[in-house]
């Protein structure tokens, strides 16, 4: 994300950051929050790049500092990716040791500010958070923390209270969809990818994952079966999905993809969708679509803590068949 894109897609954050740079009042810790379609990683990296930009304002992308950062030369930057699972205590200890007072004082560096990013900070559990709270509250001089989350209600209060919270804007879905198509992804993959993240590099990576491709195949088969009958849709759930998808990542992709489809039915939004005819066909099933999307969204948020994948699919099947649980 360059300067122009940052200002275009995140105008509020751009204003806050510009004012902070001009007034030399950078927060010790930021917590960026919003929907999954927000550009969490790209915005975080842009903030980190801005902190040392020689222009004194938003990252220019032209000075030596910006060029080094964009080239991956970032000795005083660290990133923990909580999107891939729970953040472990060892991750925080490594981070704390890197930026401890003694290690900073013993290094001869030419930085203005150091920074670290923790993506999906809601994946920090209480026992892990205890290892970083003092470090977050009393950081080494010149150190800025940048945390992100798409589930702010799940971020521990002890962490939230130590951060300046800033809501990000979601990247328009049609923009992501069209960009994915331009980059060579097919319409089915682009339909589901465009609602998964606002970080385009991440979308490209997911779009090439064989497990994601298997998930899209199961989603596509379900939608085509649903167009035929509710019974065929349930059969597809219990065969194409339950038998072929494995692992929590695939399960959450499947829940999220189906939820997006049902929400499009609810609002009759198929303007750029390969499933436009299907969405229109089920315009009378809005109540059913609403119940289904609620179930699927809850399943993602709770990470299937109390029910198996087949159990969730069975509950979805009951909704489609209008059977009370």
Model-identified regions with their sequence ranges:
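Clamp-loader machinery-focused feature within the broader ASCE/P-loop NTPase space
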Residues: 1-127
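Charged, glycine-rich active-site and insertion segments that engage polyanionic ligands
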Residues: 1-50, 68, 141-144, 150-257, ...
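Conserved adenine-binding aromatic site and its adjacent loop/helix in ATP-hydrolyzing domains
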Residues: 97, 134, 161
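Conserved catalytic/switch belt of AAA+ P-loop NTPases
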Residues: 100, 130-147
């Amino acid at each position: 994300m360059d300067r122009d894109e940052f200002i275009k897609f995140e105008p509020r954050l751009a204003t806050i950051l510009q004012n902070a740079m001009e007034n030399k009042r950078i927060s010790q810790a930021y917590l960026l929050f919003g929907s999954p379609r927000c550009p969490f990683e790209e915005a975080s990296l842009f903030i980190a790049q801005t902190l040392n930009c020689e222009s004194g304002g938003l990252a220019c992308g032209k000075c030596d500092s910006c060029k080094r950062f964009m080239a991956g030369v970032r000795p005083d930057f660290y990133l923990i990716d909580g999107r891939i699972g729970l953040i472990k205590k060892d991750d925080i200890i490594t981070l704390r040791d890197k930026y401890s007072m003694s290690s900073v004082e013993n290094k001869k560096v030419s930085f203005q500010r150091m920074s670290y990013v923790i993506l999906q900070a809601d994946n920090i559990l209480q026992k892990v958070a205890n290892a970083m709270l003092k470090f977050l509250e009393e950081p080494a001089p010149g150190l800025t923390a940048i945390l992100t989350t798409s589930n702010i209600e799940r971020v521990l209060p002890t962490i939230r209270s130590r951060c300046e919270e800033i809501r990000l804007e979601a990247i328009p879905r049609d923009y992501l969809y069209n960009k994915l198509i331009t980059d060579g992804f097919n319409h089915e993959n682009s339909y589901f990818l465009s609602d998964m993240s606002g970080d385009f590099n991440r979308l490209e990576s997911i779009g090439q994952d064989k497990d994601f491709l298997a998930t899209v195949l199961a989603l596509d088969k379900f939608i085509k079966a649903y167009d035929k009958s509710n019974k065929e849709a349930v059969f597809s759930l219990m065969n194409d999905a339950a038998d072929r998808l494995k692992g929590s990542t695939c399960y959450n992709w499947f829940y999220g993809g189906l939820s997006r489809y049902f929400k499009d039915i609810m609002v009759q939004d198929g303007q750029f969708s390969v499933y436009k005819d299907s969405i229109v066909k089920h315009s009378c099933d809005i109540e059913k679509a609403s119940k289904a999307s609620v179930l699927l969204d809850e399943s993602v948020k709770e990470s299937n803590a109390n029910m198996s994948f087949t159990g969730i699919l069975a509950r979805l099947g009951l909704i489609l068949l209008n059977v009370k649980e």
